[in-house]
Amino acid sequence: MEQTLKGDETGWWVVSDAVQIWMPQGELPRGTATEWSLQGKTARQIGEWQGQPAWLVCQGRDTDMASVRQLLDQDVGLFQLAGRGVQLAEFYRSHRFCGYCGHEMVRSKTELACLCHHCKERYYPQIAPCIIVAIRRGEEILLAQHNRHRGNMYTVLAGFVEVGETLEQTVVREVMEESQIQIKNLRYVSSQPWPFPHSLMMAFMADYAGGDIKHDPKELRDAGWFRYDQLPQLPPPGTVARRLIEDTVVLCRAYHENEG
């Protein structure tokens, strides 16, 4: 429930606007509302971390606004909590007016929703389901350079679920569209909220079944098979992509040792 801060409230402070968060000194603020000059602001508690509440304040600051990605290197759990705040702040920012009748909406006091008192429509935060998949061929893993990524990082294949698709169908389609290969033995591994801006990554592993790699230049700069002990630059620890790669490397190494 939203409340006006008196000043003595304490905890972690997710001050967010336009998919960015306030990171003074490169860290998420922690302490009382008064310490961070937040008294009088409207806030909502969005969870807890290390025994202290986490508060969302939907407002930008003139300085020290940064991407929530910075928290990945500090603490994965804190990154996930701050990412929740970023997604909620963006939801509120993009749902000021009703999409049906155009009237101004208000935030629900009892749930995470926006309400239109004119036509009685109710809106909830949108989540975009995505798949991400690691594919193994013997002692090798398929890795690719995505056009949307900077630098020389290689990672596994990923894509959005389309209307009417199952997750399994999405994996097969995305792999075919991006690499032109077939897969088998598809199995679910894990999931990770990804606040860029509001995705939910659902991770899979699969085995190579056939075909030659022909990467889609609209999506990928490069794609290829990499031996488990000759890997390129990888995604940072804490990402589900890195976990998939590390888990697949274990299988690749076991395959090499058994075949050797």
Swiss-Prot record:
Transmembrane segment boundaries: none
Residues the entry annotates as binding Zn(2+): 98, 101, 116, 119
Keyword Transmembrane helix carried by entry: no
GO molecular function, one term: NAD+ diphosphatase activity
Record's cofactor remark: Divalent metal cations. Mg(2+) or Mn(2+). Binds 1 zinc ion per subunit.
PROSITE patterns: NUDIX
Keyword Cell membrane in annotation: no
Binding of a divalent metal cation 2, residues: 174
Gene Ontology cellular component terms for the protein in this record: cytosol
SUPFAM superfamilies: Nudix (SSF55811)
Positions that bind a divalent metal cation 3: 174, 178, 219
Taxonomy, superkingdom: Bacteria
Binding-site residues, a divalent metal cation 1: 158, 178, 219
Cofactor(s) needed: Mg(2+); Mn(2+); Zn(2+)
UniProt motif (Nudix box) ranges: 159-180
Catalysed reactions, as listed in the record: a 5'-end NAD(+)-phospho-ribonucleoside in mRNA + H2O = a 5'-end phospho-adenosine-phospho-ribonucleoside in mRNA + beta-nicotinamide D-ribonucleotide + 2 H(+); NAD(+) + H2O = beta-nicotinamide D-ribonucleotide + AMP + 2 H(+); NADH + H2O = reduced beta-nicotinamide D-ribonucleotide + AMP + 2 H(+)
CDD domains: NUDIX_NADH_pyrophosphatase_Nudt13 (cd03429)
Residue sites binding substrate per the record: 69, 111, 124, 192-199, 241
Residue ranges of domain Nudix hydrolase in the record: 125-248
Subunit structure: Homodimer.
UniProt similarity note: Belongs to the Nudix hydrolase family. NudC subfamily.
Function (record text): mRNA decapping enzyme that specifically removes the nicotinamide adenine dinucleotide (NAD) cap from a subset of mRNAs by hydrolyzing the diphosphate linkage to produce nicotinamide mononucleotide (NMN) and 5' monophosphate mRNA. The NAD-cap is present at the 5'-end of some mRNAs and stabilizes RNA against 5'-processing. Has preference for mRNAs with a 5'-end purine. Catalyzes the hydrolysis of a broad range of dinucleotide pyrophosphates.
PANTHER family: NAD-CAPPED RNA HYDROLASE NUDT12, NUDIX HYDROLASE, NUDC SUBFAMILY
Stated name of the protein: NAD-capped RNA hydrolase NudC
Species of the source: Pectobacterium atrosepticum (strain SCRI 1043 / ATCC BAA-672) (Erwinia carotovora subsp. atroseptica)
